[in-house]
Amino acid sequence: MLTIADKTFQSRLFTGTGKFANKHLMASAIEASGSQLATMALKRVDIRSEQDDILQPIIDAGVNLLPNTSGAKNAKDAIFAAHLAREALGTNWLKLEIHPDPKYLMPDPIETLKAAEQLVKDGFVVLPYCHADPVLCKRLEEVGCAAVMPLGAPIGSNKGIASADFLEIIIDQANVPVIVDAGIGAPSHAARAMEMGADAVLVNTAIAASQQPVEMAIAFKLAVEAGRMAYLAGLAGKVSHAVASSPLTSFLDE
């Protein structure tokens, strides 16, 4: 079980809602993944409708919504979007995203920290998307973020855990859950993140853009479970030389 702020999750696989061919496929994939938390950009939600066409399948499945501020270019934009999301969706949970560069979508660390500090004061449960920067993640924790979401690799790149060395430090020193977000392109990437000790992973593109999203969602579900189980079981340490798994010569003396 994973507890973040006031919610407890059985699944450690969080999902995104973008890039699916249609809303029905999105809902089916999320259900197959077992995910209990799905993030959605506020700009995709019709806040004037009480039963938004995109949101409803997720709500009907009992999945928690995590609105995000994708598209915000600075702290001011993100704070405005956050309050709009809370009013429209009735949740104080927020995935904080600030990436002013439209090409690489790198999160702005200065604006993210500034926005996070204010949003926590405003009563939000803040989950910030950020660089795999151990110092920044500690600062975000110190201002009251409920979890941190460092990137594995650039958004949508499917490059996997490119920031492994830094993620290991973040995981080691964190006192809040660490959710590896962005760049996870295969179930094996998700398993690796979990084996490292990450508390959860968030996956979108790898599921939505696959040829069979529902089957891929199941694959990610199993990978996350396997990775977590391996971490708890205790992985055998790495060594620089060969170590025989059985005696090489003792049987000759028998």
Swiss-Prot record:
One of its GO terms (molecular function) is thiazole synthase activity. 1-deoxy-D-xylulose 5-phosphate binds at residues 156, 182-183, 204-205. CDD domains: ThiG. It holds the Pfam family ThiG. GO terms for cellular component: cytoplasm. Keywords: Cytoplasm, Schiff base, Thiamine biosynthesis, Transferase. The keyword Cytoplasm applies. Pathway: Cofactor biosynthesis; thiamine diphosphate biosynthesis. The active site is at residue 95. It comes from the Bacteria. InterPro entries: Aldolase_TIM, Thiazole_synthase_ThiG, ThiG. It is an enzyme of class 2 (transferase). GO terms for biological process: thiamine diphosphate biosynthetic process. It catalyses: [ThiS sulfur-carrier protein]-C-terminal-Gly-aminoethanethioate + 2-iminoacetate + 1-deoxy-D-xylulose 5-phosphate = [ThiS sulfur-carrier protein]-C-terminal Gly-Gly + 2-[(2R,5Z)-2-carboxy-4-methylthiazol-5(2H)-ylidene]ethyl phosphate + 2 H2O + H(+). It is found in: Cytoplasm. Its EC number is 2.8.1.10. Homotetramer. Forms heterodimers with either ThiH or ThiS. Catalyzes the rearrangement of 1-deoxy-D-xylulose 5-phosphate (DXP) to produce the thiazole phosphate moiety of thiamine. Sulfur is provided by the thiocarboxylate moiety of the carrier protein ThiS. In vitro, sulfur can be provided by H(2)S. Belongs to the ThiG family. This is Thiazole synthase. It comes from Vibrio atlanticus (strain LGP32).
